[in-house]
A protein has these predicted regions:
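C-terminal helical "tail/cap" subdomain of flavin- and related membrane-associated enzymes
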Residues: 270-356
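Generic enzyme active-site microenvironment
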Residues: 16-17, 127, 243, 249
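Conserved FAD-binding catalytic core of PHBH/FMO-like flavoproteins
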Residues: 128-209
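Conserved N-terminal helical subregion
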Residues: 38, 52-138, 144-150, 350
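Glycine-rich FAD pyrophosphate-binding loop
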Residues: 5-28
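FAD/FMN-dependent oxidoreductases across multiple families
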Residues: 194-270, 277-278
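N-terminal FAD cofactor-binding segment of flavoenzymes
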Residues: 25-59
Length: 356
């Protein structure tokens, strides 16, 4: 939907076709970082805090090792995915985007497809159909480097948020992300390397969360999804372009999936405004670069409990380092500059005996 909005803002005639019907819900952590909100504003969608729950920063926890930091500027918002989809749908309708729901798409030829059983011609085809993209397969764009693969599960609980942060907790079975999404509701998402683990098992492996959520009513059915770090060799071919998870992704630990999709949508519209897909192909990788680099670093902590605990103890003792890392994460500082200014110090502290 973001791609349709971005293209329509530049005057394109756009048809969105989907086999589902709104409201469309997809499993995710439901936290929009400040940079995500800025990209949404460029699409004409302004997120009122009353639509969800405001959060001021990020907290990491592993047992009694905890560190937190606030965003350098602005705040994030936790919002239920159907609410976000409804806002995007309203914006697309306002702009005059045409829509076909309950309309499966069957690719037929380079400039036409069957949409709900009827032939539909097009000049450009945008595949925004997720990790298992059929458009990607049809266009011969499946070649990719898969760097990580984990399993995610999400549910909502009727309980007032106890924190103004998005909290990431590590346990023996995986990670749990707690995002406030309303005055009396939180989103709880778990990610594990094990396919046989479910949300409750991961929560129960973290005493703090097990105690917090004891007796809390579950307000949504548990849903699952894969989370991948994947880079495609190409994201365009001929008159076909891929956006969102169809075009590659970073592990959900980054919380940047939606922001990347919004940036890609805006870049695609700019590229087609110049008459083709060259700009999109050439710059798409730069949108994925930082989230994938951050995912690599954070997944290293996920793999090695001893390193994770040391890192959290160091960051708790030097909170300015965590603030600087968060600034990099939300695009307000550069990773090379952070490494140049703080890399040696952080490495030395990791080796210091007091953090063993």
């Amino acid at each position: 939907m973001a791609a349709a909005i971005a293209l329509r803002q530049r005057g394109a005639d756009v048809l969105v076709a989907d086999a589902l019907r709104p409201p469309i819900d997809k499993p995710c952590g439901e936290g929009l970082m400040p940079d995500s909100r800025r990209e949404l504003a460029r699409l004409g969608v302004n997120m009122d805090d009353r639509l969800g729950a405001r959060f001021s920063g990020i907290l990491f926890a592993d047992g009694d090792a905890r560190v937190r930091a606030e965003f350098p500027h602005g705040a994030g918002i936790g919002v239920r995915r159907p609410v976000l989809h409804h806002l995007l749908l309203d914006r697309a309708t306002e702009l005059g985007v045409r829509m076909a729901w309950n309309a499966p798409v069957v690719m037929k030829e380079q400039n036409a497809a069957l949409v709900g059983g009827e032939r539909c011609g097009f000049r450009w085809l945008v595949g925004a159909d997720g990790h298992a993209s059929r458009v990607r397969a049809w266009a011969g764009l499946d070649a990719a480097n898969l760097r990580s693969r984990r399993f995610g599960f999400r549910a909502h609980f009727c309980i007032a948020p106890w924190s103004s942060y998005v909290e990431i907790h590590w346990g023996a079975q995986g990670q749990v992300y707690v995002t406030p999404v309303g005055p009396h509701e939180i989103c709880v998402a778990a990610i594990s390397r094990r396919s046989d683990v479910r949300l409750k098992a991961v929560i129960d492996s973290i005493p703090f969360l097990r105690n917090k959520l004891a007796g809390a009513q579950v307000s949504s059915a548990e849903r699952g999804a894969l989370t991948l770090t994947r880079r495609l060799h190409r994201v365009t071919r001929g008159n076909v372009a891929l956006v969102g998870d169809a075009s590659g992704s970073a592990d959900a630990i980054t919380g940047e999936g939606l922001a990347m999709g919004f940036r890609q949508a805006l870049l695609l519209a700019e590229s087609l405004g110049q008459g083709g897909l060259h700009l999109y192909e050439s710059r798409h990788g730069s949108i994925l670069a930082l989230p994938q680099q951050m995912a690599t670093m954070m997944l290293l902590l996920d793999r090695h409990a001893w390193l994770r605990r040391r890192a959290l103890l160091v960051l708790a003792a030097r909170p300015e380092l965590f603030r600087a890392m968060l600034a990099v994460h939300v695009g307000e500082a550069s990773l090379p500059r952070f490494l140049a200014q703080h890399g040696l110090q952080f490495g030395a502290l990791l080796l210091a005996p007091q953090f063993a």
